[in-house]
Amino acid sequence: WDAKNNRLMETSETKTSKKNWKEVIPHRDDVHLLDMEIFKDHLVINERKDGLRGLRIIHQKTGKDEYLDFGESTYTSRISTNREFNTNVVRYSYSSMLTPSSTYDYNMDSGQLTLMKQQEVVGGYDQNNYESERLYAIARDGEKVPISIVYKKDLKKVESQNLLLYAVSYTHLTLPTIAIV
């Protein structure tokens, strides 16, 4: 309702008419609210900003929020299935152009991160041999178009290197991931 990129509203179970709605997360032109998971003491939001799917954790008692820092410039993340309401641990999936599809448990109180599973990349892949960057090209209409690149660390970068464009920007396209073939 009145929010192209979505917004989050709350109401009581007994008074559900629109006049009783209270805004929890407002509409933002530059952020698309994609998904959420409710826990006893936390609200976890999956949102897209600048083409990247990130995770935002709101501590319900204090109202403070934090964005998980994945330590890479290009990535995608999704809230996984979390069946337990009374927990402070959220499970999510993560991948990037360097990191294979991974499942993590994150303790929303202590900040402890535990890798639960990671897809194997066969053939001797070592992500430490590669770099990943996020650049922007300016389109004819003046909009910034994100470009995610990955290259071997020993590559000599020069101003006029060629670029293979894998995908054109679509509204809901998130591609920064390793393709396992």
Regions found by a protein language model. Give the residues of each.
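Conserved small/polar residues in nucleotide/adenosyl-binding loops
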Residues: 171-177
